[in-house]
């Protein structure tokens, strides 16, 4: 069985013909052949392609309930791996009524999964103030979300190097490293920032230091792996 946004498919009496296995994502590697040179030139961009899958089955619910259950984007989790999930986007959905009353449906859903498996534990909050030591035990860089409470100008130092400074903070500021956005109450703070958002390096410990008038830092690491 699967869970969509932590809701079990059995709640809607969904039965799958067969659950797909999720392959490893394809790495974006380009091979170029150069005249007068043996072999080829390999350009590895260090990124991965999304993973297409199809879910086929039957459901004992209404059509609108089935469509609302999967939505357009969300989190997909398998009961066999409850500690991990994929972020997905629905690319196509086909639903047919098997019975005239519309309470037995046949469906096929095409999804595009992001290349990374996310750790459920990566949603847990890590709380500190002036320093944080974060060990990434996984094979992919993690892009955290931070809420920094404080006032004035606040700086972030990663492994001894200042990477970001934000001014004119009142009460708090949010930093979404995955979306590369700095904001407070949906007001963009990019014009008040110097530097870049950051990631937590794969298979390493990242030391963060926060300078300025900081009272508390709340960080969600978003651990993930390939």
Where do the PLM segments sit?
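Oligomerization/assembly interface segments of phage tail-like spikes and tubes
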Residues: 31-61, 103-116, 206
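Solvent-exposed loop and beta-edge segments used for protein-protein assembly and interaction
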Residues: 47-49, 70, 101-105, 138-140, ...
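Short, acidic/charged, Gly/Pro-enriched secondary-structure junctions
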Residues: 56-94
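Mixed-charge, glycine-accented linear interaction segment located at domain edges/termini
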Residues: 2-7, 112-114, 199
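Short, charged interaction patches at domain edges and termini
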Residues: 93-126
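Solvent-exposed edge beta-strands and adjacent loop segments
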Residues: 1-50, 83-97
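Intrinsically disordered, low-complexity segments enriched in serine, threonine, and glycine
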Residues: 119-226
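Short polybasic amphipathic segments
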Residues: 1-7, 74-76, 154-156, 180-184
């Amino acid at each position: 069985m699967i869970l969509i946004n932590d809701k079990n498919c059995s709640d809607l009496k969904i039965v799958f013909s067969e659950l797909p296995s999720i392959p490893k994502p394809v790495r974006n590697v380009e091979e170029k052949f150069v005249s007068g040179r043996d072999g080829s030139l390999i350009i590895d961009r260090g990124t991965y392609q999304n993973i297409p899958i199809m879910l086929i089955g039957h459901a004992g619910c209404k059509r609108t309930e089935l469509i609302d259950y999967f939505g357009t984007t969300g989190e997909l989790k398998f009961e066999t791996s409850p500690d991990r999930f994929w972020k997905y986007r629905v690319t196509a959905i086909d639903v047919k009524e098997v019975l005239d009353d519309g309470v037995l449906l046949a469906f096929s859903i095409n999804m595009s999964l992001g290349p990374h498996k996310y750790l459920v534990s990566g949603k847990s909050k890590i709380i500190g103030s002036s320093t944080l030591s974060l060990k990434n035990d996984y094979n992919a860089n993690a892009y955290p979300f931070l809420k920094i409470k404080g006032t004035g100008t606040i700086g972030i130092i990663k492994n001894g190097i200042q990477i970001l400074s934000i001014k004119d903070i009142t009460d708090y500021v949010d930093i979404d490293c995955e979306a590369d956005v700095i904001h407070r109450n949906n007001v963009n703070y990019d014009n008040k920032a110097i530097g870049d958002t950051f990631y937590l390096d794969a298979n390493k410990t990242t030391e963060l230091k926060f300078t300025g008038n900081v009272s508390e830092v709340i960080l969600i690491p978003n651990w993930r792996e390939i």
